[in-house]
């Protein structure tokens, strides 16, 4: 199995240096979070498998800090075949039982089963629409949206496009 990949995406500079005034960075000095923030967060992603990985990790995030999940990313990559949907979709109850003991991942059966379900959905979308990425990006006319937020507190809690996408998924 290939080694877990580092975050892909476009660089915005040296981690922890170039974006120190960004309000989305928070007060953290954790190198894992700074690398994610400076190289990945806010960058458009068009690779279907990379989007699948992010969706799977986000599903583990519910009720936990994002830093908790970031620190477990490599373990999730090992546990879930480097986020290769065609392998994950074939996982069974027995595989989930094994993952409930796998080190350094969240041992919540429903969350682990969610990744398997997401892989099956990913494969269906790839078949029906030709690309998971194109399907997701179609909700925003294939362009990143600048919501114009100056401060984190200005962010909307709910966006109608996100609500519709959630329903469609």
What are these regions (language model features)?
Residues 2-169:
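HhH-family (HhH-GPD) DNA N-glycosylase catalytic core used in base-excision repair
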């Amino acid at each position: 199995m290939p080694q877990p990949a580092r975050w892909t995406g476009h660089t915005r500079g040296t981690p922890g240096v170039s974006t120190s005034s960004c309000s989305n960075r928070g007060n953290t000095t954790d190198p894992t979070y700074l690398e994610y923030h400076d190289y990945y967060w806010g960058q458009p992603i068009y690779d279907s498998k990379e989007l699948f990985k992010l969706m799977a990790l986000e599903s583990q995030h519910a009720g936990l800090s994002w830093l908790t999940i970031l620190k477990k990313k490599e373990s999730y990559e090992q546990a879930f075949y480097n986020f290769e949907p065609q392998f994950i979709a074939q996982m069974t109850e027995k595989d989930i039982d094994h993952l409930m003991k796998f080190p350094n991942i969240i041992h919540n059966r429903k969350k682990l089963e969610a990744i398997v379900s997401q892989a099956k959905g990913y494969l269906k979308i790839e078949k029906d629409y030709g690309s998971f990425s194109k399907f997701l990006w179609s909700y925003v006319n294939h362009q990143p949206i600048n919501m114009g937020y100056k401060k984190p507190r200005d962010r909307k809690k709910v966006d109608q496009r996100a609500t519709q996408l959630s329903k469609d998924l």
